[in-house]
Amino acid sequence: MPAKGPLTPQQLSLINRYWRAANYLSVGQIYLMKNPLLREPLQPEHIKPRLLGHWGTTPGLNFIYAHLNRIIQQRNANVIYICGPGHGGPGMVANTYLEGTYSEIYPAISEDEAGMERLFRQFSFPGGIPSHAAPETPGSIHEGGELGYALVHAYGAAFDNPDLVVACVVGDGEAETGALATSWHSNKFLNPARDGAVLPILHLNGYKIANPTVLARLSDDDLDNLFRGYGYEPFFVEGSEPADMHQKMAATLDTIFQRIQDIKKNADVHSPERPRWPMIILRSPKGWTGPKTVDGLVVENYWRAHEVPVANCRENDAHRKILEDWMKSYDPSDLFDEKGALKPELRALAPKGEARIGANPHANGGLLRKELHMPDFRQYAVNVTEPGAIEAQSTKILGDFLRDVMKLNETEKNFRIFGPDETASNRLGSVLEATNRVWMAETLDMDDHLAADGRVMEVLSEHLCQGWLEGYLLSGRHGFFSCYEAFIHIIDSMFNQHAKWLQVARELEWRKPISSLNYLLTSHVWRQDHNGFSHQDPGFVDLVANKSADIARVYFPPDANTLLWVGDHCLKTWNRVNVIVAGKQPEPQWLTMAEAEKHCEAGLGIWEWAGTEDGLEPDIVMACAGDVPTMETLAAVDLLRQSLPHLRIRVVNVVDLMVLQSPHQHPHGISDEEFDRMFTTNRPVIFAYHGYPYLIHRLVYKRTNHSNFHVRGFIEQGTTTTPFDMTVLNELDRFHLAMEAVERLPLGESVAKPLIDNFTEKLALHKDYIRQHGEDMPEIRDWKWTWPR
């Protein structure tokens, strides 16, 4: 009895043949390096010496791709495909090859037998392409190597793209990760009146690498209840018989795309309600259409299908016969013509032009990227008449600037701010004068700044903030992510993956540049005295510094005017990760805007107004990077100037940390000549650094004067205490810095000892005072820089 459904017998035959073609090409990529159409008996030399790749998920991915092609053609839909199980890379490559996109981008992989051989040979092969849905894969914005981020990327791409449908395959293994588990809640932030739609396709093929998956072992009733609780309407497509499954999938997609159209048509622009978005739960065998058994062991529909089901095809004649029979079961002569090209009636199933999934510009976001309309950051400048004379909250000033960035780009709708419930805490609350927080869930009368059309994305999940922003950037828009410094570590690995993506994408001419990922790390280690040790960790910049020099940028603006310059600069860059570390508490303001511009453009500079060298070679260099280290350095200089009035002191402040490297190591690096001019070749350098001291040593270790660098920073000492005590615990305070300077100078014991004793006594007084009064001493709280220019 023929399978019932919307497909005519001819349509059913065609879509099944197309699926067979994708499966054939997928198997060929894993196994073959010659004889791509099996026009001669399979020989050992036709098979790759190292078999790499993942078959188990791939036939399911190919099945979905074929049916998305049908719905795109039928409804003129605008669809991109996010492949959560990115290890099914052979399928994504195969499908973009079948639709013609792959050969357009890579002409050497031509649509003939020779091109097919090159397609097969290159996969997971030296000099070829990776095994996953990497940047080299047309249509991909998600590599899917590290699992957990598919669905959050899908939602990020859908925001502000009202005509886009993001089909997102979530593997049942990936569904067990924490990031994916919370991603289901993204539907509470998707506004049907202005955003696109996300179609989650939960692919339950039953197994991970060597274990069953949790969700695959739940009943349909439990799954239905689970996802209805999340706010979805699940549609089940289950089975293993191809004809029946094709009809079920076609009928389900027909229903779902109509449902999406109705949701968007009925959405009230002014007060949209949260709909129950559809999703698919697809149950199909792992390794579907592959060998049932190998060596008497079950393969299809079991974990053994996960990677390479038949492992010894070169050496083992029986295994080679299994592979040959498997590939011939797809009947390549029914799929490809004499030249090796896909037959015309099958090629007609693929969409045309930019409607093809592999050619959709939303998956090559740089094609759609528009520069932000930017206000003049100088308009927000703090009026600094004398260094340190006034205080300001630097991030609050930046918030005013970001508010107006938001206003100027309201028409384009291509800028959002992201944060884990910290926008107000991080003193960026001014942005809420221009927009609201996105919220599609229940709203109470007492709630403020919640709206369906808001442009501030706040949810208490750093994973969602990072993933939404990545999806938003990869599809051609701009964003800004503010976070407590210690808790940005939650997304360390997500940052790693994005940086790797950018590094590869930069080398692909066809991938156009996307906007940079911009972090503001605040509520930082030196001002987390009230929350304690758990909130004190400046190590994210160490991770960033490990990445490619073409990608990584780290900035430590010491005051509001430098922060404005850095913020403006970062929002104008592309294909980078910019990390800005700045405090939110009131702090001294050092530079005029003109001075700040000059200082930031150079990346570092000598603060002549703070030093006493008078054009001569200094006796000592006091260097600093970070707002609190800068203040403590200047306070130490104040002590030294009072105690040793004839001492020649140079003060160097570093904003762009990467200038410390050489130009051979980093494009921002300064020359050895400039470095020596700044830091001397033989004088002691006392360097007060915001983070872990060893990073500075690492950055400058090849410099002439490295042996004279004495770096102080966070040495993993923390608790709930006073702000100044945090610096004392880590020996970054003014007294320790001044003592270090005295000890490194050839002063003689008669001069040095009384000074060191005095500074040591001050530290003892500090310790007693805070334990008695619960706050820092007045001379610390009220200290100001008073030396005239």
UniProtKB/Swiss-Prot annotation:
GO molecular function: aldehyde-lyase activity
Enzyme class: lyase
Documented EC number(s): 4.1.2.-
GO biological process, one term: carbohydrate metabolic process
Entry cofactors: thiamine diphosphate
The keyword Lyase is assigned to this record: yes
Keywords for this protein: Lyase, Thiamine pyrophosphate
Record-stated family: Belongs to the XFP family.
The name this protein goes by in its record: Probable phosphoketolase
Organism taxonomic ancestry: Bacteria, Pseudomonadati, Pseudomonadota, Alphaproteobacteria, Hyphomicrobiales
